[in-house]
Amino acid sequence: MKNRNNAVGPQIRAKKPKASKTVPILAGLSLGAGLQTATQYFAHSFQYQAGLGWNINHVYTPWSILQWAGKWYGQYPDDFMRAASMGMVVSTVGLLGTAVTQMVKANTGKANDYLHGSARWADKKDIQAAGLLPRPRTVVELVSGKHPPTSSGVYVGGWQDKDGKFHYLRHNGPEHVLTYAPTRSGKGVGLVVPTLLSWAHSAVITDLKGELWALTAGWRKKHARNKVVRFEPASAQGSACWNPLDEIRLGTEYEVGDVQNLATLIVDPDGKGLESHWQKTSQALLVGVILHALYKAKNEGTPATLPSVDGMLADPNRDVGELWMEMTTYGHVDGQNHPAVGSAARDMMDRPEEESGSVLSTAKSYLALYRDPVVARNVSKSDFRIKQLMHHDDPVSLFIVTQPNDKARLRPLVRVMVNMIVRLLADKMDFENGRPVAHYKHRLLMMLDEFPSLGKLEILQESLAFVAGYGIKCYLICQDINQLKSRETGYGHDESITSNCHVQNAYPPNRVETAEHLSKLTGTTTIVKEQITTSGRRTSALLGNVSRTFQEVQRPLLTPDECLRMPGPKKSADGSIEEAGDMVVYVAGYPAIYGKQPLYFKDPIFQARAAVPAPKVSDKLIQTATVEEGEGITI
């Protein structure tokens, strides 16, 4: 009969179990016992005479009977036959017992631990293999007295070993991280703050209310030697300035594409695509007007800004027809009219008055944000450039701060910035000896909290598959799977973000859909179910029969209900977290980790780092920028 396949999945590569040696050992012992019995019986028959040879308290070696038979069988054949008979009886009984053992073993069912699934919780070796814990010390390190290897990278959770000792789980690979954590669950104090208080490279941080700036900017500037930039568009003081139009590669063949992508982001603030006729036509209009503003400002020596573009379209002292005429006759390049600018103006002149008015009003509505004098001032010039995030002499930490009441209206501007960061910093790759060569000075961590609230950023979803090769590591945080997969505000059910995140971690969810997703990620395991059946008369003192059966059944290693009931953090009366809750961590290719949430304020090192006061003024990098003609961004 062909051997059955009891190893499935990854177990197919596991070492095959060695054949049991129980039966051969029992058979050998049975034969040995027979020889020993025959020897002792023969010696007893001759009163343990000295001529029988060496012994210990009248106990002889088992093979002595064979030696004696060679010498004296001819003289005492009957005595030898009686001794042999006794030995054969003992050996026969032993061999019969061995045969029964083999029969019982052959007829006993063997449990298949992998029948319905082989999921299990990770142990320390699994976590070390996944790269979340430092590897154990080698023999050379032990002998030489070298310090044990330390972990580094972003914090993805914590884990308690069998002795109750807490270990931080950190990931330093180029792969991305995706976190599911409901609001007020402790993700900030457990994952974001520890990461920003230890990551020494460049970083882009979306910071709601400015809490992360207050807790981490001081340490990052003073001890991590970062330039810290606070971009808060709606703040009247303390914010760095950044003009998106400064990133356009004006005067190159890429200028039209750059402006087209910028205009698309302006008229599509939610990331739903250009669905209506008015969006498409207003996007085409903005392309022409922005290019016209850029060239006119360049020729006149004044800066081009989005507020100035809005001013062109909404100038109360000038008829809009004069603008269209100016765009068709102005000498943009070497005294010649720019074809993209002239075409956009001609389209508006050829439209019926009602249609052109609707297109114009639609375009102006998308620029209304820049009529706020505070926002207009903060986007009127650039104190830093996008490329400096990874190419400056020092690492750069960019905090994008939005207050809750300004979050919705500032979303289009934040979307423009995130889009530009991805497109500019992942623009080229050099190779040497068939391997990519780093063309950047500093790695970049994109810590995007509540990133689905920015709307669908198609470039972010697409770029996750390749930006790791450019030194960009994304740490994406969302509330639950529904927020991520929402068709209206998220990336839809066919999103590829989860596919491109090597590490996923989760705090206790609030929605059953997220719990079901986490349960599937954890996997299915096989457990043995015991069933006891009794029979007999109800009035009898003893039951007639009791039978026990065992059956392998499947169950999720973590059911959705168990996931929803994972212990969360314990909070005080005012809502402050006092004790950490549980969490789960998933690393592709390894068993799931049932972990413990870290808390930065429980660690004296993190407490000391968070106590470093944040700078009162944002750093400005533009003085050190050397921007050549035509250098800009692909957006």
From Swiss-Prot:
The chain crosses the membrane at residues 23-39, 83-100. Keywords: Cell inner membrane, Cell membrane, Conjugation, DNA-binding, Membrane, Plasmid, Transmembrane, Transmembrane helix. It is a multi-pass membrane protein. Residues 1-22, 101-635 are cytoplasmic. The keyword Transport does not apply. Pfam families: T4SS-DNA_transf (PF02534). It comes from the Bacteria. GO terms for molecular function: DNA binding. It is found in: Cell inner membrane. GO terms for cellular component: plasma membrane. Residues 40-82 are periplasmic. InterPro entries: P-loop_NTPase (IPR027417), T4SS-coupling_protein (IPR051539), TraG/VirD4 (IPR003688). Changing K187T: Loss of transfer activity. Its main location: membrane. Changing E211Q: Decrease in transfer activity. Required for conjugative transfer of plasmid RP4. Binds tightly and specifically to the relaxase TraI. Can also bind to DNA without sequence specificity. May form a pore-like structure that could serve as a channel for DNA transfer. May form multimers of at least 18 subunits. Belongs to the VirD4/TraG family. This is Conjugal transfer protein TraG. The gene is traG.
